[in-house]
Amino acid sequence: MMEQIMLFGLYLTPLFNAIAKVESDCGVTSKNIYQISDIYIDDLNRIYPHIYPKLIKFDKVASEYAMYDYWRFYAYQYARKTGKPITYEVLARIHNGGPNGMFKATTLPHWHKVEKELKKELERAKQ
């Protein structure tokens, strides 16, 4: 796992763990821990040509690097367009709903589940 990796001032490990719990119960109920689709990977390869093979979605650490790059690109675009800060909510909703996920009402229920798990992860990190 990418320990203590930060993006936009946010520690990502608690968010990765929260998303994994919500998306797949940490891999228990899914072959793909973060539910990364081929479309997600195709989009990454459009931004960063031919870096990510489709099989990365089956590898936890490679998936985290892919998510990092996805967020690095699209969360920055969000902040630039809106002038608003990048938060865990922004990252989770972009991951769930694509480049414009933060603007989609359909990503709110997912965010609320992630937020609940994220609070647990952040509390655990304090101990």
Model segments located where?
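N-terminal secretory targeting signals
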Residues: 1-14, 120-127
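Short, functionally critical alpha-helical segments immediately adjacent to catalytic or ligand/cofactor-binding
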Residues: 11-27, 36, 67, 89-99
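Short catalytic/ligand-binding loop motif for oxyanion handling, primarily in non-cytosolic enzymes
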Residues: 28, 103-104
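Glycine-rich, phosphate-binding/catalytic loops in enzymes
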Residues: 37, 111-114
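Alpha-helical segment that forms one wall of the substrate-binding/catalytic cleft
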Residues: 43, 47-103, 114-121
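A short acidic/glycine-rich loop-to-helix N-cap element
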Residues: 105-109
